[in-house]
Design a protein with these regions (language model features):
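Conserved phosphate- and dinucleotide-binding cores of soluble alpha/beta proteins
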Residues: 1-148, 216-386
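N-terminal active-site beta-alpha-beta segment that forms phosphate/nucleotide-binding
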Residues: 1, 145-226
Length: 386
């Protein structure tokens, strides 16, 4: 919207979450009084209006730039929103500063490789030692090399893998999914390990399509991607309902099915693309451990045992703030599944329902006693698949 000179964005994304002005409107605390985001209706539908924020300066990075400022990104693992930022700042009369690894003669970069045209760039900084990642470069992330199936290390058999395996059962052949950061990021690796990675397509908000998502500090990259999209285009696809399933992680879950990932225990973690991804997906799979803080489990022989319980409740009566709205999900007809290492829950009109129990887990001692609210126990409570 900034590049196009539009006043803002009208979207269903964020309804009934912390960015909705009927809640906190995205305000961090009571110091901020003005409502930046507006709630409105159009043709009988609810929307939030996000005003355009004019940008004065941006710092972007490329790999190669020619002497006219035309830049390519062949060594970058994603294109993210580099072009969109440059356009927005330029059209606002601002300053676009581009860093690149090398400079070449004007016109020597193939036009199909150019991601940022020179007329958008005001200042070029050459850094011959710039690194692609924290620890250098990885040609598997850029797609220059293809990793063999057995070259990708499998996850150890622990609580994270238990969650990833169960979550994987929520995606079907031909589906398009998103994988978020956190405990959910192991799903792509498990899919490759199980030999089903080619049956569906996993995407990451930063742009990769297909392949196996990287984990930890390298999240946002993928190995063996089939395509690499600009991040704004990826989010257009998400916001428009293109995802069949979203795999995301949760920090807090409350009795109404709301999830908080952005602000808890006095810490501001931020949302990333969480709100967008949740808002448009047909199915939302939220992954996490039942408790946090020193939780230790033992996995083996088809069972899981709690060796040391976590110090902190994650299933609480009411979320401090709402990043994902259970109410809105039910309004939109989304299927919502919450997967932990010891149980699976689903969101219904009646509330959060316990539907599956892991082998080796006691429902009273290991589930209900460890939650801040009592879930509805399904009359068809079944065992989690081993």
């Amino acid at each position: 919207t900034a590049a196009a000179g539009q006043p803002g964005l009208l979207s269903h994304v964020g309804l009934n979450t912390f960015v909705d002005p009927r809640q906190k409107g995205g305000k961090l605390n009571d110091v901020t009084k003005e409502d930046l985001i507006k709630y409105t209706t159009l043709n009988g539908k609810e929307y939030l209006f996000y005003p355009t924020v004019p940008l004065d300066v941006c710092f972007i990075r490329a790999t190669t730039v020619d002497s006219d400022g035309y830049a390519s990104m062949e060594d970058e693992i994603t294109y993210v929103d580099v072009l969109a930022m440059a356009q927005a700042v330029h059209n606002n009369g601002g300053l676009v500063i581009l860093q690149a690894k090398r400079m070449v003669k004007a016109g020597t970069i193939h036009p199909r490789q150019v991601k940022v045209p020179g007329y958008l760039v005001d200042i070029v900084v050459i850094n011959e030692k710039q690194e692609q990642l924290y620890n250098g470069s990885d040609a598997f992330f850029t797609g220059d090399y293809i990793a063999e199936e057995d070259d990708n290390a499998s996850l150890p058999l622990d609580q994270r893998k238990v969650v990833a395996r169960r979550a994987l059962m929520e995606i079907g052949p031909g589906n398009v999914g998103n994988v978020g950061v956190g405990i959910a990021d192991g799903i792509g690796t498990v899919a490759r390990e199980e030999g089903v990675g080619e049956e569906f397509t996993l995407t990451v908000e930063t742009g990769p399509v297909g392949g196996a998502t990287a984990q930890g500090i390298f999240f946002g990259a993928s190995i063996n991607s089939k395509a690499l999209m600009d991040m704004p285009a990826q989010f257009d696809f998400y916001d428009g309902g293109g995802l069949d399933v979203a795999f995301l992680s949760f920090a807090e879950l409350d009795a109404k099915g709301n999830v908080n990932v952005h602000k808890f225990n006095g810490k501001i973690m931020g949302t990333g693309g969480f709100v967008n991804i949740c808002s448009g997906s047909k199915k939302v799979v939220l992954c996490g451990t039942l408790r946090a803080g020193g939780l230790k489990t033992e996995v083996g022989n088809g069972q899981i045992k709690v060796a040391q319980e976590g110090r902190f409740e994650k299933m609480i009566p009411e979320c401090e703030e709402i990043t994902f709205s259970g109410e809105q999900a039910l309004k939109q007809g989304q299927k919502v599944v919450y997967i932990t290492e010891r149980a699976v829950f689903e969101l219904t009109e009646e509330g959060v329902v316990l539907t599956e129990l892991a082998p080796g887990i006691d429902v009273e001692k290991d589930i209900i006693a460890q939650m801040g609210f009592k879930p509805i126990i399904s009359k068809e409570l079944k065992q989690m698949d081993e």
